[in-house]
Design a protein with these regions (language model features):
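Acetyl-CoA-dependent GNAT
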Residues: 8-12, 16-89, 93, 98, ...
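Conserved acetyl-CoA-binding loop-helix of GNAT-fold acetyltransferases
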Residues: 97, 103-116, 142-143
Length: 143
């Protein structure tokens, strides 16, 4: 697998379609005694959801940060978009992996490379925001 910066020649890769993901539980975050903690609530029934497709503009993405693609034999498997921020951490704006390649380390490799590039830009690291009802994503980000 190759992790590459999305070039202008591959700008169409920024509009990788979103695919469905399973909603099977919720992460409940709390702060007790000056310590962060969380608990997990599993839904009685899971359901599937999909985000609307984005329409990213390559020039705008590059002006605000950078984008990485994960490729095998030039096939796009995953996408990560990072944005500059006024904080000391770069923002992971979007992360997606095709269903067929999820749980194979694609997202982790995209984040690893994004973290390296963020450090090169003078950031201390990266951060993101996750939806509490997307338990698979929340658990992934906790690793």
């Amino acid at each position: 697998m190759d992790i590459k910066l999305i070039s202008q020649e591959r700008a169409e890769d920024l509009n990788m379609p979103n695919e469905a993901f399973e909603l099977f539980g919720k992460l409940n975050v709390q702060r007790l005694d000056q310590q962060w903690d969380y608990s997990i609530h599993y839904f009685e029934e899971s359901k599937w959801d999909v985000f609307p497709d984005e329409s990213y503009d390559w020039q705008q993405v590059m002006t605000q940060g950078f984008a990485l693609g994960a490729y095998v034999d030039e096939q796009l498997l995953g996408l990560a978009i990072f944005q500059d921020d006024w904080k000391k951490f770069m923002y992971l704006h979007d992360l997606k992996v095709t269903q067929a390649f999820r749980k194979n380390g694609v997202a982790a490799e995209l984040i690893k490379k994004g973290h390296e590039l963020a450090l090169e830009r003078g950031y201390r690291g990266i951060y993101t925001i996750g939806q509490d009802n997307n338990l698979a994503a929340c658990r992934f980000y906790l690793k």
